[in-house]
Amino acid sequence: MLDPALLRQHPADLAERLRSTRSFDLNIAELELLESERKRIQVRTQELQSQRNSKSKAIGQAKAKGEDVAALMAEVAGFGDELKASEEALDAIRAKLEGIALGLPNLPAEDVPLGKDESENVEQSRWGTPRQFDFAVKDHVELGAPHGWLDGETAAKLSGARFTVLRGPVARLHRALAQFMLDLHVGEHGYEETNVPLLVNADSMRGTGQLPKFEDDLFQTEVGESRRYLIPTSEVPLTNIVRDEIIDAERLPLRMTAHSMCFRAEAGSGGRDTRGMIRQHQFEKVELVTACAPEDSDAEHQRMTRCAEVVLEQLGLPYRKVLLCTGDMGFSAIKTYDLEVWLPSQNTYREISSCSNCGDFQARRMQARWRNPVSGKPELLHTLNGSGTAVGRAMIAVMENYQNADGSIDVPQVLRPYMGGLERIG
């Protein structure tokens, strides 16, 4: 959530920044009307509260003197209903203003390029050279389906579209990738392994920015009066660990990682990526989350992105690093790097990791703070999140980049200890 002071004090400036960087139209007239009404009702509410307090004090003094307080009691009762109505109206106005604030995206950092969509993202670097094949390249479905290793038909029978059953050595490869990523991030990159719930409450979803804007893309469960959401990424529970907390400076930065299933309705994906495992309702990801002091978030962003790059480099997968433009950034981010891995079957790079600095945007929603040792006061943390990496897409990239003419797949050297020494699949 943006600083409420921006909404109250500089609505026109904020509206222009949102329009120019996010193509977001803020209704200033509605905002100013609500703010004016809030001020009016708040003044009247405070007047009534002051009168109540004054009369209550007078009643106490009169009782102490043994005087008749019936008239004073009647007077208090006379404006009690108005005070209650005024307080309720004030709460309603505040709720509307908060609803507007919760729907506003974060403001991009100054060094983020302006752009309308992914076509205006800016490539930063490339690593590795895409392999030149001397045979017709197969995609991951053609490599896995004939052996029953990758089975979309059975998954469709069980659950519908955008699900996949994995079997045999490909299922083991998928598991090996997740274990390798966790071991790397914990053992070499200093993240703390964390096992998180897959079901979270609405407060958690609001904290990281999924609610209220993206509710249509979330899977929900209801049991009685209890509603929970299946996580779209373990960013949600990991980041919310610091919700309503004040973290001592000595504990910062907090670096956490989790391997989890993720669930997305893909409400806006239409007919994109319907073949294979590129875009699924259920998938697995190794997530990286950091909470730190504001002055450290830029360096932590670079560090986190580098940690994700190391995964791809150790797997020997060519990739490129892209700085997202304002029109392609996520709702909560101030700056985002995407890592895109080379897929031979598509002859292009596809996103496999997205690493974002969210500044104090999520922390303000969560009231996640740290105690500044200089001032001694609680201040908002900065939060960051990144994929380290998507497991299914990493598996696809390994299958396609390491394929042989006979349809077999070489196992990357770094994964062989996790595969019982297996050097080739098929």
UniProtKB/Swiss-Prot annotation:
Annotated residues for binding of L-serine: T233, S234, E235, E287, S387
SUPFAM superfamilies, alphabetized: Class II aaRS and biotin synthetases, tRNA-binding arm
Binding positions for ATP per the UniProt entry: R264, A265, E266, E351, I352, S353, S354
A Pfam family the protein falls into: tRNA-synt_2b
Location in or out of the cell: Cytoplasm
Cystine pairings recorded for this chain: none
Keywords: Aminoacyl-tRNA synthetase, ATP-binding, Cytoplasm, Ligase, Nucleotide-binding, Protein biosynthesis
Catalytic EC class: ligase
Pathway membership: Aminoacyl-tRNA biosynthesis; selenocysteinyl-tRNA(Sec) biosynthesis; L-seryl-tRNA(Sec) from L-serine and tRNA(Sec): step 1/1
Record field: catalytic activity: tRNA(Ser) + L-serine + ATP = L-seryl-tRNA(Ser) + AMP + diphosphate + H(+); tRNA(Sec) + L-serine + ATP = L-seryl-tRNA(Sec) + AMP + diphosphate + H(+)
MF terms in GO: ATP binding; serine-tRNA ligase activity
EC number: 6.1.1.11
One of the GO BP terms on file: selenocysteine biosynthetic process
Quaternary structure and partners: Homodimer. The tRNA molecule binds across the dimer.
Similarity comment: Belongs to the class-II aminoacyl-tRNA synthetase family. Type-1 seryl-tRNA synthetase subfamily.
Functional note: Catalyzes the attachment of serine to tRNA(Ser). Is also able to aminoacylate tRNA(Sec) with serine, to form the misacylated tRNA L-seryl-tRNA(Sec), which will be further converted into selenocysteinyl-tRNA(Sec).
Name of this chain's protein: Serine--tRNA ligase
